[in-house]
């Protein structure tokens, strides 16, 4: 496996881990939430006001941004 593939695999694992962490955190606050629900936390005021949830959500967004940027860079 190439180094590029190893890095993408690692990023994928980080994204999955963070998605699971975020869903668990959200469900601790609102038990019935789905993975789709947490993509729109503004629909849930309790999540929108939660600084821990927002921090973890931004961590996920950061991982996704790195992955997207890295894939674009590989195509250049």
Question: Where do the protein language model's features map onto the residues?
Answer:
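Charged/polar positions within long, soluble alpha-helices
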Residues: 20-34, 68-75
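Short, charge-rich amphipathic interface segments used for partner binding and complex assembly
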Residues: 33-72
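Short, charge/polar-rich alpha-helical segments
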Residues: 1-27
């Amino acid at each position: 496996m190439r180094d590029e593939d190893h890095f993408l695999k690692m990023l994928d694992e980080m994204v999955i881990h963070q998605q699971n962490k975020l869903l668990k955190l959200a469900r601790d606050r609102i038990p019935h939430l789905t993975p789709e629900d947490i993509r729109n936390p503004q629909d849930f005021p309790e999540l929108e006001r939660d600084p821990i949830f927002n921090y973890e959500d931004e961590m996920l967004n950061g991982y996704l941004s790195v992955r997207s940027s890295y894939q674009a860079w590989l195509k250049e």
